[in-house]
């Protein structure tokens, strides 16, 4: 249960990045869906894997529900708040961590959007091909196993993700997969988390496979 003592702990850890104001809670009460908004007890804005871990350890200890929130483009009610819980907004985790053009891969934090990433990659002649329509966050696309209009050629999120950093409900931080094109080293934990919609842990970093930008396009009308 969220009480004054727990709120004080969060404020001590996150300072101005923990809010219980009604206006802030209302801003993160739902996505772009038609569901009724639900205001969580508080909203916290972590910036690192370790800070997400601190939130989940504290919430796990006190049995407080959590709702991960990215860019809020969900149409299925994924990010509707919890009146007894905390919304964990990852919008400050929006850094492109590395790009390896020669190997056609990159690593990003969860709230990097597809448009942000492709704008960054354009001059290098590569792009991130999954396009679900909205300018979604990469972490949200991984959590919902997004696809899009180019899935026939480029596949879905399961096709282009080679590894993840995930914070488990108890606060443990794990890394799955690798940069290699194929690995037989143990269970495929990466695919376990893709599409899990935050129920198994919070995805904080994503390792992506990139594609060359097409030289030309052909449009067909049916």
Predicted regions and their residues:
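Structural signature of FAD isoalloxazine-binding scaffolds in flavoprotein oxidoreductases
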Residues: 45-46, 76-94, 109, 150-170, ...
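Anion-binding (especially nucleotide phosphate/pyrophosphate-binding) glycine-rich loop
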Residues: 80-93, 98-138
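N-terminal flexible segment immediately upstream of the FAD-binding catalytic core
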Residues: 1-57, 73-104
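Conserved phosphate/anionic-ligand binding catalytic regions in large, soluble enzymes, centered on
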Residues: 192-202
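Hydrophobic, small-residue-rich alpha-helical packing segments that form membrane-like cores
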Residues: 116, 121-122, 130, 134-136, ...
